[in-house]
């Protein structure tokens, strides 16, 4: 371990295996707080590489509580959070709409990073249990096309890093790991990142982690597909990464100002998104979710983004997505 730490102090890059060893030590409580702080800051100042991020994610997945992984295609749609936008929960809403469109989503999430309401804050406000046993969550994925996996339930090792992370008060590699450590190990994903500089490195990380198809996105300061600005995309497909931009026109949707997506407390977000998922939402909210669902449907092989967006809008306006929220809430 001292050799690995010394490499970091010399601004050298760790291999994927070394990073995995380091993070295995971190999540099993083997590092002193000063060592942990030094390692995290050394990586941050130099800039974390895809192999270091992949090694860390591999360590966390190996330590995670097991989830009975399905053999059918399923996805996650998730953002790093921390974009500072304090917007409504686009990815959480998109998961329910995608489920109502007929694809399966195992959403991995946590409490808020920078907004007043993270994905699990919202789900709790909907009355959805955050601690369903893994078998019951898998059953919900089978029968309702959607389940939610609450990060702390599966990743107990995070607790060893929490005090240091809180004291450092700055972003570290842990801020990008959340979307990469879904214990269900989905082969497909749409992952939003808080900085355009992370789009390509996270796509390269997903390749190392063995994802079949995934899109990493950043849209005008937000960790999702945006309608107020062009969205930067790095798409991984069968081991190849393609970079491109998406505009509202690519989805056949209108442009909307970022302020139109402003969120509030979990209760306020619940009320806004209840109306949206019941088919009574605001146009800006409907179209923002439709754009994100459209890209997610592409990961399942539905290649036409305009068709996908129209399908998502029709689903939103039918109120079918709300049935999935209500059915999941009934399970505990």
UniProtKB/Swiss-Prot annotation:
| Keyword annotations | Amino-acid biosynthesis, Aromatic amino acid biosynthesis, Glycosyltransferase, Magnesium, Metal-binding, Transferase, Tryptophan biosynthesis
Question: Quaternary arrangement and interactors, per the entry?
Answer: Homodimer.
Q: Which organism is it from?
A: Erwinia tasmaniensis (strain DSM 17950 / CFBP 7177 / CIP 109463 / NCPPB 4357 / Et1/99)
Q: Which residues bind anthranilate 1?
A: 79, 110
Q: Which reaction equation describes what this protein catalyses? A: N-(5-phospho-beta-D-ribosyl)anthranilate + diphosphate = 5-phospho-alpha-D-ribose 1-diphosphate + anthranilate
Which amino acid positions bind anthranilate 2, per UniProt?
165
- What GO cellular component entries does it have? cytosol
Q: How is the cofactor bound?
A: Binds 2 magnesium ions per monomer.
- What are the binding positions for Mg(2+) 2 in this chain? 223-224
The name on file for this protein is Anthranilate phosphoribosyltransferase
């Amino acid at each position: 371990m001292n050799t690995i730490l010394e490499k970091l102090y010399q601004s050298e890059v760790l291999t994927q295996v070394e990073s995995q060893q380091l993070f295995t030590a971190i999540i099993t409580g083997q590092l002193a707080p000063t060592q942990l702080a030094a390692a995290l800051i050394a990586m941050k100042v130099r800039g974390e590489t895809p192999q270091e991020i992949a090694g860390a994610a591999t360590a966390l997945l190996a330590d995670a509580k097991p989830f009975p992984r399905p053999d059918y295609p399923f996805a996650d749609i998730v953002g790093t959070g921390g974009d500072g936008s304090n917007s409504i929960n686009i990815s959480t809403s998109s998961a329910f709409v995608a489920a109502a469109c007929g694809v399966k989503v195992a959403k991995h999430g946590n409490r808020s990073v920078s907004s007043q309401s993270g994905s699990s804050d919202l789900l709790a406000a909907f009355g959805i249990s955050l601690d369903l046993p893994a078998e019951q969550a898998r059953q919900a994925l089978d029968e309702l096309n959607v389940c939610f996996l609450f990060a702390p339930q599966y990743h107990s090792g995070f607790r060893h890093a929490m005090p240091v992370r809180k004291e450092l008060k700055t972003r570290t590699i842990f801020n990008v790991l959340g979307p990469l450590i879904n214990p269900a190990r989905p082969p497909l994903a749409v992952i939003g990142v808080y900085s355009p500089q992370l789009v390509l490195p996270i796509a390269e990380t997903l390749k190392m982690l063995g994802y079949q198809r995934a899109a990493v996105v950043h849209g005008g300061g937000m960790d999702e597909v945006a309608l107020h600005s062009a969205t930067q995309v790095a798409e991984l497909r069968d081991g190849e990464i393609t970079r491109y931009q998406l505009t509202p026109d690519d989805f056949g949707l209108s442009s909307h100002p970022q302020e139109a997506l402003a969120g509030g407390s979990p209760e306020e977000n619940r009320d806004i998104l209840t109306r949206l998922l019941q088919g009574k939402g605001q146009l800006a909210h409907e179209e923002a979710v439709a754009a994100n669902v459209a890209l997610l449907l592409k990961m399942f092989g539905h290649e036409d983004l305009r068709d996908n967006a129209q399908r998502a809008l029709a689903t939103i306006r039918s109120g079918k997505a709300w049935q999935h929220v209500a059915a999941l809430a009934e399970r505990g």
